[in-house]
Amino acid sequence: MSDDWESKTVIGSRARVGGGGPRATVAKTQAEINAAMRSGNVLSTDKKYASANSKDGGDGQRLTKIDRSDDIIAPPKVEASVGKAIIKGRSEKGLTQKELAVKINEKPQVVNDYESGRAQPNQQVLSKMERVLGIKLRGKDIGLPLGPKGKK
């Protein structure tokens, strides 16, 4: 009974000194992971799957087709008609490749690749070119003038 009078009851942040056991911590660097391996702690590496600002790829069907086939499939390229339409529209506006690139906020090499048919089609770049040049570059009717802007 004298033990009850001499023992201390600790309340607060230090109540679990020694008896709490190891806590689960997240190692953010490779050095922390290596230190945990050396000390013999239980180690689990998990990958975060959900992300707030991640985008899924738009090439899903194409990649599946590539996986299922044995031969080598080249990535899609811009059609020659699109390149010719860009050259024609650019010359009508009196723009150089560099000036067009500045207007669409891209590098001159990108414009050159589209005109020569080497580029992979990017919808954002094509839409910027359509707006600056005033001609259609996607779908059917490539090279025809864009219609008037819609009313809101």
UniProtKB/Swiss-Prot annotation:
> What protein family does this chain belong to?
Belongs to the MBF1 family.
SUPFAM superfamilies referenced in this protein's UniProt entry, alphabetically = lambda repressor-like DNA-binding domains
Q: Which PANTHER family match?
A: ENDOTHELIAL DIFFERENTIATION-RELATED FACTOR 1, ENDOTHELIAL DIFFERENTIATION-RELATED FACTOR 1 MULTIPROTEIN BRIDGING FACTOR 1
An example GO BP is: GCN2-mediated signaling
The molecular function terms in GO held by this entry are: DNA binding; ribosome binding
Superkingdom of the source? Answer: Eukaryota
* Domain HTH cro/C1-type stretches: 86-140
**Alphabetized InterPro entries for the sequence:** Cro/C1-type_HTH, Lambda_DNA-bd_dom_sf, MBF1_N
Q: Which residues bind DNA?
A: 97-116
> What is one term from the GO cellular component aspect held by the record?
nucleus
In its UniProt entry, the species of origin is given as Yarrowia lipolytica (strain CLIB 122 / E 150) (Yeast)
Task: Give me the ranges of the annotated region Disordered.
Answer: 1-24
Entry function:
Transcriptional coactivator that stimulates GCN4-dependent transcriptional activity by bridging the DNA-binding region of GCN4 and TBP (SPT15), thereby recruiting TBP to GCN4-bound promoters. Involved in induction of the ribosome quality control (RQC) pathway; a pathway that degrades nascent peptide chains during problematic translation. Required to prevent stalled ribosomes from frameshifting.
Query: Could you tell me which PROSITE patterns the record lists for this protein?
Result: HTH_CROC1
Protein name in UniProt: Putative multi-protein-binding factor 1
The answer to whether UniProt assigns keyword Ligase to this entry is no
What keywords would UniProt list here? Activator, DNA-binding, Transcription, Transcription regulation
